[in-house]
């Protein structure tokens, strides 16, 4: 009998211990807790990098063709280049001139077409009869691209106000066929496209 009592008592004690543990765990869940939280949201918007040539007309003569040129002739064309207010400032603006229709006029780097780009601090004064335009500057003329062969990629442009948003540059692009161009340049045709590319300013903390 004694053995049986001990066994029974052991089972009861074990059961009570389990029940007690369960009750203890359940009791933990009934305690209250004070909490406080706060939050904030950050609005993030991206800027705009955008430069634009002027519309056709006196603010963009680049698409006006020149024909019947001979050695020594020059071709002057103007265009405005604008970085509108509200856009981002730029770290650089480059020019790529590529021939979509090619000939020796653009492939001969020495005796083919040469280009130079300058700008006027005010609007260029236009004279001449289309397409033989000429331009004078009543303000200050500044070099943007030194004389070189017409075709080139990612050519660095200097002294541009349009690096800063809200500014416009009054550009003049002048093409010249050197006097050294010989008879092999007769009867040729080239179409040269000019692409201006603006690069975003240096990244910074915002």
Briefly describe each language-model feature range.
Residues 44, 51, 95, 115-117, ...:
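Generic structural hydrophobic/aromatic packing signal, biased to beta-strands
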Residues 33-35, 77-135:
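Surface-exposed interaction patch
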Residues 35-40, 49, 98-106, 159-163:
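Intrinsically disordered, low-complexity boundary segments flanking structured domains
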């Amino acid at each position: 009998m004694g053995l049986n009592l001990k066994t029974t008592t052991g089972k009861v004690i074990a059961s009570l211990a389990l029940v007690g543990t369960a009750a203890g765990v359940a009791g933990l869940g009934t305690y209250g807790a004070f909490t406080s939280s706060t939050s904030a949201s950050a609005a993030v918007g991206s800027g705009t990098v955008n430069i634009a040539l002027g519309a056709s007309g006196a603010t963009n003569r680049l698409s006006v063709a020149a024909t019947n040129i001979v050695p020594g002739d020059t071709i002057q064309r103007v265009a405005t280049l604008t970085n509108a207010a509200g856009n981002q400032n730029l770290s650089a603006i480059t020019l790529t001139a590529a021939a979509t229709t090619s000939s020796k006029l653009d492939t001969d780097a020495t005796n083919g077409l040469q280009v130079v780009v300058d700008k006027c601090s005010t609007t260029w004064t236009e004279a001449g009869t289309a397409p033989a335009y000429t331009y004078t500057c009543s303000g200050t003329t500044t070099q943007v691209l030194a004389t070189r062969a017409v075709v080139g990629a990612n050519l660095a442009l200097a002294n541009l106000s349009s690096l800063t948003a809200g500014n416009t540059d009054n550009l003049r692009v002048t093409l010249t066929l050197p006097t050294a161009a010989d008879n092999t340049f007769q009867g040729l045709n080239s179409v040269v496209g000019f692409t201006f590319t603006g690069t975003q300013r240096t990244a910074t903390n915002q």
